[in-house]
């Protein structure tokens, strides 16, 4: 998503800075909340006295949704508190830096791809009558999107650090000569 926002050569010219920074923060809140939900549910399931009846998949989806909502609320308040009264250039600078960072753009691509894939799978399951997360209503769909964002983040980490060794392919700059 980040790569679709306009990106200027200079930070002070960056448009949509509030939207860019808020979108970034809320997207990270979805992934963080889902990870917290997955960890809490896994711990509860591993301790027999805390284990509740019901399918694990439902517990994971609902826990991911609940923790995503809580995390998004906390992070939203944190963003407001952190950026309250800041000059527009500070919003522009932070947004510009996000758009300038190739790793951040790649993380966003993978995260949104994971969310989209999970939502597509949820929709297909619902259309085919297989149930899936959609049978839990909006909470199941939101949980699927959150877990998809975690899957996308894991895919990004495997791609960037496993396959590519953490390095980016360097692009030739116009006017630069390659080595002798």
Task: Give a label for each model feature.
Residues 6, 42-58:
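Membrane-interface helix-loop junction between the first two transmembrane segments
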Residues 84-180:
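Membrane-interacting alpha-helical segments
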Residues 19-32, 61, 65, 102-111, ...:
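Membrane-penetrating hydrophobic segments
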Residues 40, 70, 74, 78, ...:
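Alpha-helical transmembrane segments of multipass membrane proteins
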Residues 59-84:
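Hydrophobic alpha-helical membrane-embedded segments
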Residues 1-38, 54-55, 158-180:
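Intrinsically disordered, low-complexity N-proximal targeting/linker segments that flank membranes
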Residues 32-42, 115-123:
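Canonical alpha-helical transmembrane segments of integral membrane proteins
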Residues 42, 46, 80, 157-161:
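Hydrophobic membrane-targeting alpha-helices
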């Amino acid at each position: 998503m980040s790569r679709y926002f306009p990106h200027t050569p200079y930070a002070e010219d960056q448009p949509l800075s509030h939207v860019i920074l808020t979108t970034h923060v809320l997207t990270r809140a979805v992934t963080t909340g889902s990870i917290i939900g997955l960890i809490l549910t896994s711990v509860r399931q591993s301790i027999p006295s805390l284990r509740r009846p019901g399918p694990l998949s439902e517990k994971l989806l609902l826990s991911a949704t609940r923790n995503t909502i809580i995390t998004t609320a906390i992070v939203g308040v944190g963003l407001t508190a952190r950026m309250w009264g800041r000059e527009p250039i500070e919003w522009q600078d932070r947004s510009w830096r996000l758009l300038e960072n190739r790793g951040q753009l790649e993380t966003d691509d993978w995260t949104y791809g994971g969310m989209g894939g999970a939502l597509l799978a949820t929709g297909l399951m619902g259309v085919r009558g297989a149930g899936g997360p959609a049978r839990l209503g909006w909470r199941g769909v939101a949980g699927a999107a959150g877990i998809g964002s975690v899957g996308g983040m894991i895919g990004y980490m495997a791609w960037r650090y496993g396959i590519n060794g953490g390095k980016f392919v360097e692009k030739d700059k116009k006017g630069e000569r390659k080595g002798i």
